[in-house]
């Protein structure tokens, strides 16, 4: 039995006044829930966590922390053409990452246009978002540039907290402050009506803003946590006919988390960084999509993945290689 697919288009997003990815998903799929964490929002789908929900952009996996945490704020809603949600297990096609479901974001890449757009929003607690897009597409060549900045001061509901049977003062926030930057660039080239190429790259960072630890009050921290990622990719598509396509895609991602010390601690001075985790992800896929009959689609493909993680305490890299071939109909 096929799993149900929900689709929300750019026009529906605009009419509903949706400004972020979390709002769009909440409207689409009642089985989705969110709760805040250091990476932004922790997603739950059909009772399963981020780790078992596959998030794709134009069919390519979005990577984050190895535990499955992905900062959903890095999805630029001004670029979204539509969002497709496969609500239910899809592990036979996508692997164990997709036991809870699949979310695929399709972005808009207009042709024969020179356009610049700016989108800003400001809400309570000094929550600010600014997005900039520049599209230059003429003839066979296209360039699509995006930048998004997000900031929040964080807040606390009460300056008091329980400590056993006592009520004491605290500076611990209910929601952490943060600042993030997200830059992406994509180039496309249509060599012929049948053959096209693309190359893309991006940079992302997010820094948390905790209150500094103090001796006279609880709730402070010795350090802030920062997250940083680079990604790059390239691919080609050859159209044998209207319903028959051969496609190659490669993507890479480096992701690191660090402590930025606020006070002198563990041999580090204020302002110095300590690496806590480094991840590398590489994925290469060659596939063919064929419409042998009017009402069916058949895929044949091979996929190679390499994942690497390094922790400073071990000073060693651990690698995992995965090769697979598939042919669902």
Put a short name on every predicted segment:
Residues 60-87:
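Short acidic/polar hinge/loop motifs at secondary-structure boundaries
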Residues 41, 101, 114-116, 128-132, ...:
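Hydrophobic, lipid-facing positions within transmembrane beta-strands of outer-membrane proteins
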């Amino acid at each position: 039995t096929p799993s149900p697919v929900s689709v929300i288009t750019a026009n529906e997003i605009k009419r509903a006044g949706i400004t972020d990815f979390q709002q769009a998903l909440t409207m689409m799929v009642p089985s989705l829930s969110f709760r805040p964490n250091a990476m932004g929002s922790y997603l739950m789908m059909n009772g399963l966590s981020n780790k078992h929900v596959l998030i794709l952009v134009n069919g390519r996996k979005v990577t984050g922390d190895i535990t499955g945490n992905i900062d959903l704020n890095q999805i630029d809603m001004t670029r979204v053409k539509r969002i497709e949600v496969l609500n239910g297990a899809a592990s036979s096609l996508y692997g164990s990452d997709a036991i809870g479901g699949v979310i695929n974001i399709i972005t808009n890449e207009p042709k024969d246009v020179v356009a610049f757009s700016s989108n800003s929003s400001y809400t309570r607690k000094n929550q600010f978002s600014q997005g900039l897009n520049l599209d230059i597409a003429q003839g066979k060549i296209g360039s699509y540039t995006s930048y998004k900045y997000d900031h929040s001061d964080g807040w606390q509901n009460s300056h008091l907290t329980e400590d056993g049977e006592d009520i004491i003062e605290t500076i611990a926030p209910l929601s952490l402050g943060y600042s993030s930057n997200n830059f992406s660039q994509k180039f496309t080239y249509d060599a012929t009506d049948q053959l096209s190429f693309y190359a893309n790259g991006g940079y992302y960072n997010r820094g948390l803003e905790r209150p500094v630890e103090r001796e006279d009050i609880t709730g402070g921290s010795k350090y802030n946590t920062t997250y940083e990622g680079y990604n790059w990719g390239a691919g080609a598509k050859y159209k044998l006919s209207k319903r028959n396509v051969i496609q190659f895609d490669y993507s890479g991602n480096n992701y690191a988390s660090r402590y930025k010390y606020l006070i002198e601690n563990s041999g580090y001075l204020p302002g110095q960084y300590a690496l806590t985790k480094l991840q590398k992800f590489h994925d290469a896929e060659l596939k063919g999509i064929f419409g042998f009959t009017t009402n069916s689609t058949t895929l044949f493909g091979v996929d190679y993945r390499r994942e690497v993680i390094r922790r400073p305490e071990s000073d060693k890299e651990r690698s995992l290689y995965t090769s697979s071939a598939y042919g669902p109909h």
